[in-house]
């Protein structure tokens, strides 16, 4: 039987990206900058007492990204003479329920005594000793509004061992199965035309079964999985408490996060689409292999970062989604269909056919500096010269109602790509059939090309545009598949 889990990362939001790490007593091959994000978790070759078994499972340190090894071995009593100290500073203040450590998880070795001091500026907010008893250990102590941690490692659980830390987490991860989840639903959505960038959502109700405090914070990440398949990563947008142990939580995806910060805009000439998207979203995206970079000329007016990303994606001619990964996936929709058979399809499939599009008009823009211009970007005024590119449907009959799609606000569409962009939008709107079918989800992702049964014994082939997922141990998804 499959298993569905929701992992709530009860961590200080954005603290890992905000952290700067320094250390006394770290080995020369340690890359302490990896501590907030995590380094390699390996059984390494070393000269430690009774550590390196000749079983072929230990590997060389040089071939891996080690976050932290101490320079010094602990003594016969497991205590360090010169105690390693790790200092982590932040540019912003953060709050968390404590600090988690991943020590030598490959062998079970761990630091067995440490001290953490939390600071706000020069003020010591908390000072606490901990005695870890596992290679993964949570040092529980709630502290709010701190901007520095000083961690002192006192000793190891076995004598003559290095202190090894693969990751420091500013909080802890809590996983819940369906016994603790009263209800949960996911809506994952994309726009194959890139004329919009929808926000995908997770709404769930959690019933706490243990006497544990929670510190739900905006933008804390939540992962949803069915077995080993990642459905999506979402971020807390708000919550309500309806009983002592019952919480209703609303979450959105990375595009929802981008919608809450502004982009100042700019004017660009032959700017790499990939580098411009990186400037907007901060590198939290991947581009699939079939997508080639392109150069864009035009402007982005001041707007939210989600709106700015949409401008780039549309002019680039690609799609984006957040399902099935941590971050944004930039891709071209699949063209080789995989079949979703009747064994995974519930009864009640339907097909809706949209009205014929009689023409598409796309407005291209050219921006030149002009003191009397109508566009203001960063305090500089620009004149916007526009050109309209049209593609007309040659198969329109006398009985067809006029239905013209007009795209006027795509400010990164220049004259060089105006006609090809109009053709691309026209081609998209020739796909008029939307098949709605409820399926047993098996890892399908937005943009996948699939063939699904319809209500009259045939099939419809197209790309997945939307999935409304009701979470249980068997995951059912109401899919919308757009085809010809």
Feature map (PLM): residue ranges:
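Viral virion structural and adsorption modules
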Residues: 1, 22-81, 321, 329, ...
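Surface-exposed, non-catalytic interaction/assembly patches
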Residues: 1-37, 131, 171-195, 259-269, ...
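Surface-exposed cap/loop segments at beta↔alpha junctions
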Residues: 1-56, 173-178, 196, 209-284
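Short beta-strand-centered interaction patches in the first periplasmic/extracellular domains
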Residues: 1-13, 123, 142-150, 156-172, ...
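Polar, enzyme-active/binding microenvironments
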Residues: 37-173
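An acidic/polar, Gly/Ser/Thr-rich interaction patch typically located in mid-to-C-terminal regions
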Residues: 79-83, 92-95, 102-118, 188-217, ...
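Acidic, low-complexity/disordered segments
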Residues: 108, 123-182, 243-268, 374, ...
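Short capping motifs at secondary-structure boundaries
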Residues: 281-286, 316-318
